[in-house]
């Protein structure tokens, strides 16, 4: 924890076997405006390298993303995401480069607490931004308890965004969601509770 509002995150692992060699690293920087708890943001960068020992193939992947959530008012919440994925791989002698970008936003309105309704829109681009796929959906949610929410929704149209969107369903069609909001203070309270027993 860097300060009252800022937190840095880092994780790395490396695995080597007779069949495969894999390394992965994740770096993140999180912000929470603790004075009013109305703004959260997270920037993340992930790197993965895979080298199968027998084939000579390889895969190098980079994913960068930024997420933000803003409680604009008591009833209105807005969140958005920007992400990009770069992939270089060699398979069966052929080398390929892939780059895709994702931008998305969602607004939720609490019309009759604990019920809320939401609208979401997204765009996925590739081939130097020349190719675009769009997505849009509607959602109905209910707060089950403090910081716990369940939802059902329908994406009117959408796309697959492998490796880019970790929390949202982007495929067309119906979906069910469940969310739990927490921070590092939860783990502190669990430790204190365990020590008191």
Task: Label the predicted regions.
Residues 1-197:
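Gram-negative and organellar
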């Amino acid at each position: 924890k860097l300060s009252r509002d800022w937190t840095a995150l880092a994780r790395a692992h490396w695995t080597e076997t007779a069949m495969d060699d894999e390394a992965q690293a994740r770096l993140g920087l999180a912000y929470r405006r603790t004075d009013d708890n109305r703004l959260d943001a997270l920037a993340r960068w992930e790197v993965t390298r895979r080298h199968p020992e027998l084939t000579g193939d390889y895969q190098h992947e980079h994913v960068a993303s930024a997420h933000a959530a803003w409680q604009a008012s008591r009833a209105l919440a807005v969140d958005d995401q920007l992400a990009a994925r770069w992939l270089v791989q060699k398979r069966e002698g052929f080398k390929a480069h892939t780059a895709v970008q994702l931008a998305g936003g969602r607004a939720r309105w609490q019309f009759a607490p604990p019920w809320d309704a939401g609208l979401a829109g997204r765009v996925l681009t590739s081939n130097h931004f020349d190719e675009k796929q769009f997505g849009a959906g509607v959602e109905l949610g209910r707060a089950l308890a403090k910081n716990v929410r369940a939802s059902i929704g329908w994406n009117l149209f959408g796309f697959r965004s492998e490796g880019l969107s970790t929390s949202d369903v982007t495929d067309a069609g119906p979906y069910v969601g469940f969310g739990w909001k927490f921070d590092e203070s939860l783990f502190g309270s669990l430790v204190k509770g365990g020590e008191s027993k």
